[in-house]
Amino acid sequence: MKRDYYEVLGVSRSADKDEIKKAYRKLALKYHPDKNPDNKDAEDHFKEVNEAYEVLSNDDKRRRYDQFGHAGVGSSAASGGGGGQYGGGADFSDIFSAFNDMFGGGGGGSQRRRAASGIPGVDLKIRLKLTLEEIAKGVEKTIKIKKQVPCKECNGSGSKTGATETCPTCHGAGEVRQASKTMFGQFVNIAACPTCGGEGRIVKDRCPSCYGEGIKQGEVTVKVNVPAGVQEGNYLTLRGQGNSGPRGGAPGDLIVMIEEKPHELFVRNGDDVIYSLAVSFPDLVLGTKVDVPTLEGAVKLTIPAGTQPETMLRIPGHGIGHLRGSGKGDQYVRVNVYVPKELTQQDKDLLRDLRKSPSIAPEAHSAGGAKSFFEKARDIFG
Protein backbone atom coordinates (compact mmCIF):
# COMPACT_ATOMS: atom_id res chain seq x y z
CA MET A 1 0.00 0.00 0.00
CA LYS A 2 1.34 3.42 -0.99
CA ARG A 3 2.38 5.78 1.78
CA ASP A 4 0.82 9.21 2.11
CA TYR A 5 2.81 11.66 -0.05
CA TYR A 6 3.01 14.24 2.74
CA GLU A 7 4.38 11.53 5.02
CA VAL A 8 6.93 10.55 2.36
CA LEU A 9 8.32 14.11 2.23
CA GLY A 10 7.87 14.69 5.96
CA VAL A 11 5.76 17.84 5.59
CA SER A 12 2.35 18.90 6.86
CA ARG A 13 -0.69 19.17 4.62
CA SER A 14 -0.55 22.96 4.93
CA ALA A 15 3.06 23.10 3.70
CA ASP A 16 3.72 25.66 0.99
CA LYS A 17 5.71 25.02 -2.18
CA ASP A 18 8.97 26.21 -0.67
CA GLU A 19 8.65 23.79 2.25
CA ILE A 20 7.81 20.94 -0.11
CA LYS A 21 10.75 21.75 -2.37
CA LYS A 22 13.13 22.01 0.58
CA ALA A 23 12.01 18.62 1.93
CA TYR A 24 12.32 17.08 -1.54
CA ARG A 25 15.87 18.38 -2.01
CA LYS A 26 16.98 16.96 1.31
CA LEU A 27 15.52 13.51 0.70
CA ALA A 28 16.55 13.34 -2.96
CA LEU A 29 20.14 14.06 -1.96
CA LYS A 30 19.96 11.45 0.79
CA TYR A 31 18.66 8.65 -1.43
CA HIS A 32 20.19 9.59 -4.80
CA PRO A 33 21.58 6.48 -6.57
CA ASP A 34 24.95 8.14 -7.09
CA LYS A 35 25.36 8.33 -3.32
CA ASN A 36 23.90 4.86 -2.75
CA PRO A 37 25.24 2.53 -5.46
CA ASP A 38 23.77 -0.99 -5.47
CA ASN A 39 21.35 -0.05 -2.68
CA LYS A 40 17.88 -1.27 -3.67
CA ASP A 41 16.23 0.23 -0.59
CA ALA A 42 17.66 3.68 -1.32
CA GLU A 43 16.59 3.38 -4.95
CA ASP A 44 13.01 2.59 -3.89
CA HIS A 45 13.00 5.56 -1.51
CA PHE A 46 14.34 7.79 -4.29
CA LYS A 47 11.50 6.74 -6.59
CA GLU A 48 8.95 7.27 -3.83
CA VAL A 49 10.28 10.76 -3.06
CA ASN A 50 10.19 11.76 -6.73
CA GLU A 51 6.64 10.46 -7.12
CA ALA A 52 5.47 12.38 -4.06
CA TYR A 53 7.18 15.58 -5.20
CA GLU A 54 5.71 15.41 -8.69
CA VAL A 55 2.20 15.37 -7.25
CA LEU A 56 2.62 17.86 -4.40
CA SER A 57 4.55 20.40 -6.50
CA ASN A 58 1.78 20.48 -9.11
CA ASP A 59 -1.24 22.56 -8.03
CA ASP A 60 -3.80 20.53 -9.97
CA LYS A 61 -2.44 17.13 -8.96
CA ARG A 62 -2.09 18.24 -5.36
CA ARG A 63 -5.71 19.44 -5.31
CA ARG A 64 -6.94 16.10 -6.66
CA TYR A 65 -4.70 14.17 -4.27
CA ASP A 66 -5.90 16.22 -1.29
CA GLN A 67 -9.50 15.52 -2.21
CA PHE A 68 -9.39 11.89 -3.26
CA GLY A 69 -6.02 10.52 -2.14
CA HIS A 70 -4.04 8.21 -4.43
CA ALA A 71 -7.21 7.44 -6.38
CA GLY A 72 -7.39 11.09 -7.47
CA VAL A 73 -4.06 11.01 -9.30
CA GLY A 74 -4.22 7.40 -10.49
CA SER A 75 -0.98 6.19 -12.00
CA SER A 76 0.01 9.58 -13.39
CA ALA A 77 2.46 10.20 -10.59
CA ALA A 78 4.36 7.06 -11.32
CA SER A 79 4.41 7.49 -15.07
CA GLY A 80 4.37 11.21 -15.72
CA GLY A 81 6.71 13.80 -16.98
CA GLY A 82 10.28 12.74 -16.70
CA GLY A 83 10.52 9.44 -18.51
CA GLY A 84 13.89 8.80 -16.88
CA GLN A 85 15.08 5.76 -15.07
CA TYR A 86 13.41 6.72 -11.83
CA GLY A 87 10.18 8.16 -13.32
CA GLY A 88 8.23 10.94 -11.72
CA GLY A 89 9.18 13.98 -13.80
CA ALA A 90 10.73 15.89 -10.91
CA ASP A 91 13.07 18.78 -11.66
CA PHE A 92 16.53 17.50 -10.74
CA SER A 93 17.88 21.04 -10.71
CA ASP A 94 16.10 21.28 -7.35
CA ILE A 95 18.46 18.65 -5.98
CA PHE A 96 21.67 20.26 -7.06
CA SER A 97 20.66 23.80 -6.16
CA ALA A 98 20.40 22.51 -2.61
CA PHE A 99 24.20 22.52 -2.38
CA ASN A 100 24.08 26.32 -2.22
CA ASP A 101 22.00 25.98 0.94
CA MET A 102 24.42 23.52 2.51
CA PHE A 103 27.89 24.75 1.57
CA GLY A 104 29.42 28.18 1.36
CA GLY A 105 30.83 29.65 -1.85
CA GLY A 106 29.46 29.62 -5.37
CA GLY A 107 26.57 32.02 -5.65
CA GLY A 108 26.87 33.20 -2.10
CA GLY A 109 24.26 30.89 -0.57
CA SER A 110 20.47 31.03 -0.53
CA GLN A 111 18.44 34.09 0.30
CA ARG A 112 17.31 34.57 3.86
CA ARG A 113 13.90 33.07 4.50
CA ARG A 114 11.54 35.63 5.93
CA ALA A 115 9.58 34.60 8.98
CA ALA A 116 5.97 33.75 8.41
CA SER A 117 3.22 35.68 10.14
CA GLY A 118 2.60 33.35 13.05
CA ILE A 119 2.88 29.58 13.32
CA PRO A 120 0.61 27.57 10.98
CA GLY A 121 -2.34 25.84 12.62
CA VAL A 122 -2.42 22.08 13.03
CA ASP A 123 -4.44 20.00 10.57
CA LEU A 124 -7.60 18.53 12.05
CA LYS A 125 -8.86 15.04 11.18
CA ILE A 126 -12.47 13.97 11.62
CA ARG A 127 -14.46 10.91 10.56
CA LEU A 128 -17.69 11.19 8.59
CA LYS A 129 -20.02 8.18 8.41
CA LEU A 130 -22.17 7.95 5.29
CA THR A 131 -24.98 5.66 4.18
CA LEU A 132 -24.75 3.80 0.89
CA GLU A 133 -27.59 5.98 -0.42
CA GLU A 134 -25.57 9.14 0.33
CA ILE A 135 -22.48 7.69 -1.31
CA ALA A 136 -24.44 6.65 -4.40
CA LYS A 137 -25.58 10.19 -5.23
CA GLY A 138 -23.18 12.43 -3.31
CA VAL A 139 -24.32 14.58 -0.42
CA GLU A 140 -23.74 17.87 1.38
CA LYS A 141 -23.33 17.40 5.13
CA THR A 142 -23.42 20.12 7.77
CA ILE A 143 -21.41 19.11 10.82
CA LYS A 144 -20.21 20.67 14.05
CA ILE A 145 -16.57 20.32 15.00
CA LYS A 146 -14.45 21.39 17.93
CA LYS A 147 -11.20 23.10 17.03
CA GLN A 148 -8.79 25.90 17.89
CA VAL A 149 -10.27 29.28 16.90
CA PRO A 150 -8.87 32.84 17.19
CA CYS A 151 -9.24 34.35 20.65
CA LYS A 152 -12.01 36.97 20.61
CA GLU A 153 -10.45 39.00 23.43
CA CYS A 154 -7.27 39.81 21.50
CA ASN A 155 -8.48 39.13 17.94
CA GLY A 156 -6.01 36.27 17.71
CA SER A 157 -2.92 38.41 18.27
CA GLY A 158 -2.07 36.93 21.66
CA SER A 159 -1.47 40.44 23.00
CA LYS A 160 -3.83 42.35 25.28
CA THR A 161 -2.96 45.55 23.45
CA GLY A 162 -2.09 43.99 20.10
CA ALA A 163 1.53 45.07 20.48
CA THR A 164 4.48 42.96 19.31
CA GLU A 165 8.17 43.64 18.94
CA THR A 166 10.90 42.30 16.67
CA CYS A 167 12.70 39.31 18.12
CA PRO A 168 16.10 40.48 19.41
CA THR A 169 17.72 37.10 18.70
CA CYS A 170 16.90 36.61 15.00
CA HIS A 171 16.04 40.24 14.23
CA GLY A 172 12.76 39.24 12.63
CA ALA A 173 14.12 36.49 10.38
CA GLY A 174 12.52 33.68 12.37
CA GLU A 175 15.65 31.55 12.01
CA VAL A 176 19.19 31.39 13.28
CA ARG A 177 22.27 30.19 11.40
CA GLN A 178 25.48 28.69 12.66
CA ALA A 179 28.43 28.31 10.30
CA SER A 180 31.16 25.71 10.70
CA LYS A 181 34.04 24.62 8.48
CA THR A 182 34.32 21.05 7.27
CA MET A 183 36.52 19.23 4.78
CA PHE A 184 33.87 20.00 2.15
CA GLY A 185 33.89 23.72 2.86
CA GLN A 186 31.72 25.91 5.01
CA PHE A 187 28.62 24.20 6.40
CA VAL A 188 25.65 26.34 7.48
CA ASN A 189 23.10 24.95 9.92
CA ILE A 190 19.71 26.68 9.81
CA ALA A 191 17.17 26.28 12.63
CA ALA A 192 14.05 27.99 13.92
CA CYS A 193 14.82 30.78 16.34
CA PRO A 194 14.53 29.43 19.90
CA THR A 195 13.40 32.80 21.27
CA CYS A 196 10.40 33.47 19.03
CA GLY A 197 9.74 29.95 17.78
CA GLY A 198 10.30 31.00 14.18
CA GLU A 199 7.75 33.83 14.18
CA GLY A 200 10.22 36.69 14.07
CA ARG A 201 8.24 38.71 16.60
CA ILE A 202 7.56 38.53 20.34
CA VAL A 203 4.20 39.26 21.96
CA LYS A 204 4.05 42.08 24.51
CA ASP A 205 1.34 42.28 27.20
CA ARG A 206 0.08 38.72 26.82
CA CYS A 207 -3.69 38.28 26.61
CA PRO A 208 -4.99 36.83 29.91
CA SER A 209 -7.79 34.94 28.13
CA CYS A 210 -5.61 32.86 25.80
CA TYR A 211 -2.31 33.26 27.72
CA GLY A 212 -0.66 34.84 24.72
CA GLU A 213 -1.42 31.99 22.31
CA GLY A 214 -4.03 33.87 20.29
CA ILE A 215 -6.23 30.75 20.04
CA LYS A 216 -8.85 29.03 22.19
CA GLN A 217 -10.97 25.90 21.95
CA GLY A 218 -14.24 26.56 20.15
CA GLU A 219 -17.02 24.93 18.14
CA VAL A 220 -17.87 25.77 14.54
CA THR A 221 -20.22 24.50 11.84
CA VAL A 222 -18.82 23.48 8.47
CA LYS A 223 -20.34 22.19 5.26
CA VAL A 224 -18.77 19.20 3.54
CA ASN A 225 -19.63 18.43 -0.08
CA VAL A 226 -19.09 14.72 -0.65
CA PRO A 227 -19.01 13.57 -4.30
CA ALA A 228 -20.70 10.37 -5.41
CA GLY A 229 -18.58 7.23 -5.44
CA VAL A 230 -16.30 7.81 -2.46
CA GLN A 231 -15.14 4.73 -0.59
CA GLU A 232 -14.15 3.78 2.92
CA GLY A 233 -10.71 5.27 3.57
CA ASN A 234 -11.02 8.12 1.05
CA TYR A 235 -10.63 11.59 2.51
CA LEU A 236 -11.61 15.13 1.59
CA THR A 237 -9.45 18.14 2.40
CA LEU A 238 -11.03 21.47 3.30
CA ARG A 239 -8.27 24.03 2.94
CA GLY A 240 -7.99 26.46 5.84
CA GLN A 241 -10.81 24.83 7.84
CA GLY A 242 -8.58 23.18 10.42
CA ASN A 243 -7.17 24.57 13.66
CA SER A 244 -6.31 28.27 13.67
CA GLY A 245 -2.64 29.11 13.98
CA PRO A 246 -1.29 30.78 17.12
CA ARG A 247 -1.07 34.58 16.99
CA GLY A 248 -2.47 35.03 13.51
CA GLY A 249 -0.82 32.02 11.91
CA ALA A 250 -2.45 30.50 8.85
CA PRO A 251 -5.10 27.91 9.71
CA GLY A 252 -4.47 24.24 9.05
CA ASP A 253 -6.67 22.01 6.92
CA LEU A 254 -9.68 19.93 7.87
CA ILE A 255 -9.20 16.32 6.78
CA VAL A 256 -12.52 14.48 6.48
CA MET A 257 -12.03 10.70 6.55
CA ILE A 258 -14.88 8.79 4.89
CA GLU A 259 -16.49 5.83 6.65
CA GLU A 260 -19.22 3.71 5.05
CA LYS A 261 -22.08 2.46 7.21
CA PRO A 262 -23.03 -1.20 6.73
CA HIS A 263 -26.26 -1.60 4.74
CA GLU A 264 -29.02 -3.99 5.79
CA LEU A 265 -29.93 -4.92 2.19
CA PHE A 266 -26.97 -4.33 -0.11
CA VAL A 267 -23.35 -5.40 -0.34
CA ARG A 268 -21.05 -3.02 -2.21
CA ASN A 269 -18.60 -4.21 -4.86
CA GLY A 270 -16.81 -1.17 -6.27
CA ASP A 271 -19.53 0.93 -7.87
CA ASP A 272 -21.89 -2.05 -8.12
CA VAL A 273 -24.23 -3.34 -5.41
CA ILE A 274 -25.48 -6.88 -4.78
CA TYR A 275 -28.90 -7.77 -3.39
CA SER A 276 -29.95 -11.29 -2.37
CA LEU A 277 -33.51 -12.28 -3.31
CA ALA A 278 -35.33 -15.39 -2.07
CA VAL A 279 -37.78 -16.81 -4.67
CA SER A 280 -40.15 -19.76 -4.32
CA PHE A 281 -39.52 -22.95 -6.29
CA PRO A 282 -42.67 -22.52 -8.47
CA ASP A 283 -41.67 -18.95 -9.37
CA LEU A 284 -38.19 -20.09 -10.39
CA VAL A 285 -39.65 -22.82 -12.57
CA LEU A 286 -42.52 -20.84 -14.11
CA GLY A 287 -41.00 -17.35 -14.06
CA THR A 288 -42.48 -14.24 -12.44
CA LYS A 289 -42.11 -10.50 -11.90
CA VAL A 290 -41.17 -9.15 -8.49
CA ASP A 291 -40.53 -5.77 -6.86
CA VAL A 292 -36.86 -5.41 -5.97
CA PRO A 293 -35.47 -2.63 -3.73
CA THR A 294 -32.68 -0.44 -5.13
CA LEU A 295 -30.81 2.57 -3.80
CA GLU A 296 -33.34 4.75 -5.63
CA GLY A 297 -36.54 2.86 -4.79
CA ALA A 298 -38.27 -0.34 -5.88
CA VAL A 299 -38.19 -1.55 -9.51
CA LYS A 300 -39.84 -4.47 -11.33
CA LEU A 301 -37.53 -7.38 -12.09
CA THR A 302 -38.40 -10.25 -14.39
CA ILE A 303 -37.40 -13.70 -13.16
CA PRO A 304 -37.19 -15.82 -16.35
CA ALA A 305 -38.75 -19.28 -16.33
CA GLY A 306 -36.21 -21.95 -15.42
CA THR A 307 -33.95 -19.58 -13.48
CA GLN A 308 -31.44 -21.57 -11.44
CA PRO A 309 -30.62 -20.84 -7.79
CA GLU A 310 -27.64 -18.49 -7.34
CA THR A 311 -28.23 -16.88 -10.73
CA MET A 312 -27.11 -13.22 -10.88
CA LEU A 313 -29.57 -10.89 -12.64
CA ARG A 314 -28.41 -7.38 -13.63
CA ILE A 315 -30.28 -4.09 -13.24
CA PRO A 316 -28.21 -1.56 -15.25
CA GLY A 317 -27.50 1.90 -13.85
CA HIS A 318 -28.86 1.29 -10.35
CA GLY A 319 -25.52 1.16 -8.58
CA ILE A 320 -23.25 3.91 -7.26
CA GLY A 321 -22.23 7.04 -9.14
CA HIS A 322 -18.68 6.94 -10.50
CA LEU A 323 -16.21 9.10 -8.58
CA ARG A 324 -14.42 10.11 -11.77
CA GLY A 325 -16.54 10.53 -14.87
CA SER A 326 -20.27 10.25 -15.44
CA GLY A 327 -22.55 7.25 -15.13
CA LYS A 328 -23.28 4.72 -12.43
CA GLY A 329 -22.54 1.15 -11.57
CA ASP A 330 -25.14 -1.62 -11.73
CA GLN A 331 -27.19 -3.59 -9.26
CA TYR A 332 -26.94 -7.36 -9.30
CA VAL A 333 -29.67 -9.55 -7.84
CA ARG A 334 -28.56 -12.94 -6.58
CA VAL A 335 -31.52 -15.30 -6.84
CA ASN A 336 -31.87 -18.00 -4.19
CA VAL A 337 -34.60 -20.57 -3.76
CA TYR A 338 -36.84 -20.19 -0.73
CA VAL A 339 -37.39 -23.49 1.11
CA PRO A 340 -40.31 -23.32 3.58
CA LYS A 341 -39.89 -25.07 6.92
CA GLU A 342 -43.59 -25.56 7.60
CA LEU A 343 -46.11 -26.96 5.11
CA THR A 344 -49.77 -27.98 5.24
CA GLN A 345 -50.69 -31.59 4.56
CA GLN A 346 -52.12 -30.55 1.20
CA ASP A 347 -48.80 -28.89 0.26
CA LYS A 348 -46.90 -32.02 1.20
CA ASP A 349 -49.21 -34.22 -0.88
CA LEU A 350 -48.76 -31.96 -3.91
CA LEU A 351 -44.98 -32.06 -3.56
CA ARG A 352 -44.98 -35.84 -3.24
CA ASP A 353 -46.98 -36.12 -6.45
CA LEU A 354 -44.64 -33.64 -8.16
CA ARG A 355 -41.59 -35.56 -7.00
CA LYS A 356 -42.79 -38.57 -8.99
CA SER A 357 -42.59 -36.62 -12.26
CA PRO A 358 -39.41 -37.51 -14.24
CA SER A 359 -39.26 -34.00 -15.75
CA ILE A 360 -38.14 -32.44 -12.47
CA ALA A 361 -35.37 -34.93 -11.71
CA PRO A 362 -31.96 -33.19 -11.47
CA GLU A 363 -29.55 -33.68 -14.32
CA ALA A 364 -26.53 -35.86 -13.73
CA HIS A 365 -23.56 -33.90 -12.43
CA SER A 366 -20.75 -33.42 -14.91
CA ALA A 367 -17.60 -31.32 -15.33
CA GLY A 368 -19.53 -29.01 -17.64
CA GLY A 369 -22.48 -28.67 -15.26
CA ALA A 370 -23.97 -25.56 -13.73
CA LYS A 371 -21.53 -23.03 -12.31
CA SER A 372 -21.49 -22.26 -8.62
CA PHE A 373 -22.41 -18.80 -7.30
CA PHE A 374 -18.75 -17.98 -6.73
CA GLU A 375 -17.88 -18.93 -10.32
CA LYS A 376 -20.72 -16.78 -11.62
CA ALA A 377 -19.68 -13.85 -9.46
CA ARG A 378 -16.10 -14.24 -10.70
CA ASP A 379 -17.31 -14.18 -14.32
CA ILE A 380 -19.30 -10.99 -13.69
CA PHE A 381 -16.89 -9.01 -11.55
CA GLY A 382 -13.56 -10.44 -12.68
From Swiss-Prot:
Residue ranges constituting the J domain according to the UniProt record: 4-69
Subcellular location: Cytoplasm
Listed cofactors: Zn(2+)
Biological-process GO terms, alphabetical: chaperone cofactor-dependent protein refolding; DNA replication; protein refolding; response to heat
GO annotations of cellular component type: cytoplasm
Segments annotated as CXXCXGXG motif repeats: 151-158, 167-174, 193-200, 207-214
Protein residues bound to Zn(2+) 2: C167, C170, C193, C196
GO molecular function: ATP binding; heat shock protein binding; unfolded protein binding; zinc ion binding
Domain of life, source organism: Bacteria
Cofactor binding comment, as recorded: Binds 2 Zn(2+) ions per monomer.
CR-type Zn finger ranges: 138-219
Pfam families the record matches: DnaJ, DnaJ_C, DnaJ_CXXCXGXG
Keywords of this entry: Chaperone, Cytoplasm, DNA replication, Metal-binding, Repeat, Stress response, Zinc, Zinc-finger
Keyword Metal-binding applies: yes
SUPFAM superfamilies registered for this protein in UniProt: Chaperone J-domain (SSF46565), DnaJ/Hsp40 cysteine-rich domain (SSF57938), HSP40/DnaJ peptide-binding domain (SSF49493)
Binding residues annotated for Zn(2+) 1, in chain numbering: C151, C154, C207, C210
Metal-binding recorded as keyword: yes
Entry domain remark: The J domain is necessary and sufficient to stimulate DnaK ATPase activity. Zinc center 1 plays an important role in the autonomous, DnaK-independent chaperone activity of DnaJ. Zinc center 2 is essential for interaction with DnaK and for DnaJ activity.
NCBIfam families listed in its UniProt record: DnaJ_bact, PRK10767.1, PRK14281.1
UniProt xrefs under HAMAP family: DnaJ (MF_01152)
Family, similarity comment: Belongs to the DnaJ family.
Name this protein carries in UniProt: Chaperone protein DnaJ
UniProt organism field: Chlorobium luteolum (strain DSM 273 / BCRC 81028 / 2530)
